[in-house]
Every structure is written in structure tokens, then in C-alpha cells.
């Protein structure tokens, strides 16, 4: 009997409580600052693509939704000839962003990717490239890749020193 009265009181309180429903397209709830949404490819400050087609993003992707085809410029620099992401399979885990050595792949807070056809959720390189530098303005991979840091140079290790 006590359980029934408790239930009736709880329902009575909830009837007069304010609603928490949000009319979604017109009103949007605030997203967390680090929300992971749509993936974009960024550019260097000089306007070139940051992606070097190393395929680390595709290897890190747990659902295998990234496909990269590598090409090479006459001066020997790699670039993605095609870069495709299937957002129908993407789980927005962020592993591709973490694996990217050049900060070319970045996740934006844009989470509205719904579509009526699954084929429209496959984005090509042209759809993913943005004109800006993304989260890391001024960063250029080729300025820091392979350069020695002053004071960090060490002598080569003798393998015999590693033995007990």
C-alpha cells in the first residue's frame, strides 16, 4: 500500500513539474566544448594541404571508414590523390585526429550530418578540405619535421653498454 501511495505522489509531482523538452531544429542544446563531430582536412599557412598521405589515420580507424590513395609530387612530397571518409560508418572516436602527425585531420563540433541516402555520407577530399588552418594556426609540418632541437642531441648508444 505504501508503494502505491509513493507512486501516486511521485506522478503527481511530475505532472506539475516544468517540461524539459526542447524543440530541436529551432532550439539547440549547447554542445560540450570538446564535442567530436564532422572531420575536416586543413591547410598549411601557405595554402597547401597538410596531409602527407601516410595512411596512419586509416590504420588507426577502428571501423575502417577512411580510404587514402597516395601520390607523389615531382619534388618527392607525398599528397593524397584521393581521401574518402564514409560518415555512415564513422563513430567519431577521434583516433584519426590523434594519429595524424601533421594535424591535417581535425574534428569539428558540427554534428548535424543526417541524410536520407547512405551514399551521400561518403565525403571526398574536395568536401573535406577547408580553406583555413583549423585548430593549429601557423603550424607547418615541413618546418619542424626532421630538424634537430638545440641541446637535445645525444651521442650514439653503444650496444655493449646495454648488456648486464
Curated annotation (Swiss-Prot):
Gene that this polypeptide is encoded by: nuoI2
Protein's name according to its UniProt entry: NADH-quinone oxidoreductase subunit I 2
EC number: 7.1.1.-
SUPFAM superfamilies, A to Z: 4Fe-4S ferredoxins
Pfam entry (one): Fer4_7
Family to which this protein belongs: Belongs to the complex I 23 kDa subunit family.
Enzyme class: translocase
Complexes and interactors: NDH-1 is composed of 14 different subunits. Subunits NuoA, H, J, K, L, M, N constitute the membrane sector of the complex.
Subcellular localization, as worded in the UniProt entry: Cell inner membrane
